[in-house]
Regions:
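Active-site helix of classical SDR
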Residues: 130, 166, 174
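Alpha-helical segment proximal to the catalytic Tyr-Lys
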Residues: 135, 179-183, 240
Length: 255
């Protein structure tokens, strides 16, 4: 069967999906018929407008879509958000922990605030959503959890010790959850994007971009859809015997 029929009418929850990779994942799932709940942080009118614009774009694909403004790093708030999503959709079959930020800097110059912010938004938020969604998936005796990690979570990166540590944590979290929840039919995996063309990477200086391209055998940056396609595979029954794995999506940069 195709991946499309596998996720058709399933309920997916994607965090941090108003833009970038998260949005691409939500759109891909929706294009295959999955209903979408997504979250993102809303601090001002522009962010609120972005959230609603993405919701309409997803809904236009012919599925049910609801957007939930909130801080994924807040444990109590996440419990309430997931409870609301479960009431609104009736089930949560797929969870993609995508909410993430960077606050780069060399370790010796890094502030405690830079460290805490990245660990909270990237790693703690993943724990928060897994903690809230797991009982639902266990009662359903099935579900797929996907953590959005990074190649730097596998290999490290100078100037990104906070980000790399948070992404390595997301990988170990996925592996541990795969072991804990596997007996009840819940799978957990991580995807590790390499150099992906997003607003986040567009800000990099040209010489750094050139340097990256030389390290990539396919000689190009990835597209957000490249990540979404692998997430679709992991969300679907095509990957029903795949759990506790890290899939690097990096054009062959790391082997």
């Amino acid at each position: 069967s195709s991946a499309a029929s596998d996720v058709y009418k399933r309920q997916a929850l994607v965090t941090g999906a108003a833009r970038g990779i998260g949005k691409a994942v939500a759109m891909k799932f929706a294009s295959e018929g999955a209903n979408i709940a997504f979250t993102d942080l809303v601090l001002n009118d522009d962010m609120a407008a972005g959230l609603e614009a993405t919701r309409k774009e997803i809904e236009a694909l012919g599925v049910t879509c609801r957007a939930y403004a909130g801080n994924a790093a807040d444990f109590e708030e996440t419990q309430k958000t997931v409870k609301q999503i479960h009431e609104d959709f009736g089930s949560i079959d797929i969870l993609v922990n995508n909410a993430g930020i960077t606050k780069d800097g060399l370790m010796l110059r890094m502030s405690e605030a830079q460290w805490d912010a990245v660990l909270n938004v990237n790693l703690k938020s993943a724990f928060n959503f897994i903690h809230a969604c797991s009982p639902i998936m266990l009662r359903q005796r099935g579900g797929s959890i996907i953590n959005m990690a990074s190649v730097v979570g596998v290999h490290g990166n100078a100037g990104q010790c906070n980000y790399a540590a948070s992404k390595a944590g997301m990988i170990a979290l996925a592996k541990s959850i795969a072991q804990e929840l596997g007996p009840k039919g819940v799978r957990a995996n991580a995807v590790a994007p390499g150099f992906i063309e997003t607003a986040m990477t567009a800000q990099l200086p040209e010489e750094i971009r050139k340097d990256w391209m030389q390290k990539i055998p396919l000689r190009r940056g990835g597209q957000t859809e490249d990540i979404a396609n692998v997430c679709l595979f992991l969300a679907s029954d095509l990957s029903s015997y795949v759990s506790g794995q890290v899939i690097q999506i990096d054009g062959g940069m790391n082997m």
